[in-house]
């Protein structure tokens, strides 16, 4: 049997935001008996199960909370959802990734300045749902630049991205919007809200894919980071 060589990517493992969120929750779980997270704290079932063994349960709606402590997941939430939680007078532990929080602030600032906001991202992803809330009325999330031109475009248009998207695909998207929207838009502002640590992992996956015969991406199926790594490598090598 031929010898099989296994090589790991030079960048791998949980990103800083996820590691931070897990550490915060683990510390809180050791100090308190009842903690609930609004959705899974991270998109990794092994971590969710381990935290459940420590007494941390996940709920999908604020109405399911019976008291105690609520933790906001690393993906962040909308201001509307935050208000619902605060109205229940619960103690809140916020594990929102700092990079995601920066994207939320960018969306809020654009909205306050009168820009219509477009988010390059998956509309059903928890992070993007939160960003849409910070981006104000009329904000949209899409991965298709063609959709933008079909809208009733505002005179001032701002674009940000879901933090885990591909840099190259975000650049392609913004170029498409520039070409299609400029005849109608007076001012266009693009803010790079992508996570640099995520980009390093994508670059490492690409680097490994071009010299491999088979690529195995280890992660959870509903993780945006895992999906992006598979998308990067699959056009080059069986993944």
Predicted regions and their residues:
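The feature marks the mature, well-folded catalytic cores of soluble enzymes
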Residues: 1-239
């Amino acid at each position: 049997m031929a010898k099989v060589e296994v090589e790991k990517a030079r960048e791998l493992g949980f990103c800083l935001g996820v590691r931070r969120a897990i550490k915060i929750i683990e510390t809180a779980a050791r100090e308190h008996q009842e903690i609930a997270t609004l959705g899974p704290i991270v998109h990794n079932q092994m971590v969710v199960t381990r935290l459940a063994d420590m007494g941390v349960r996940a709920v999908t709606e604020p109405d399911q909370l019976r008291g105690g402590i609520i933790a906001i997941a690393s993906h962040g939430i909308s201001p509307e959802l935050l208000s619902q939680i605060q109205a229940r007078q619960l103690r809140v532990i916020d594990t929102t990734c700092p990079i995601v929080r920066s994207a939320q602030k960018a969306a809020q600032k654009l909205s306050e300045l009168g820009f219509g906001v477009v988010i390059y991202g998956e509309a059903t992803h928890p992070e993007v749902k939160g960003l849409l809330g910070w981006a104000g009325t009329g904000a949209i999330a899409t991965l298709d630049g063609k959709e933008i031109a079909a809208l009733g475009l505002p005179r001032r248009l701002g674009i940000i991205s879901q933090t885990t998207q591909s840099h190259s695909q975000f650049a392609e998207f913004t170029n498409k919007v520039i070409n299609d929207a400029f005849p109608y838009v007076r001012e266009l502002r693009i803010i790079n809200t992508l996570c640099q640590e995520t980009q390093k992992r994508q670059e490492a996956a690409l680097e490994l894919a071009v010299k491999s015969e088979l690529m195995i991406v280890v992660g959870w199926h509903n993780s945006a980071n895992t999906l992006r790594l598979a998308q990067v490598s699959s056009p080059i090598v069986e993944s």
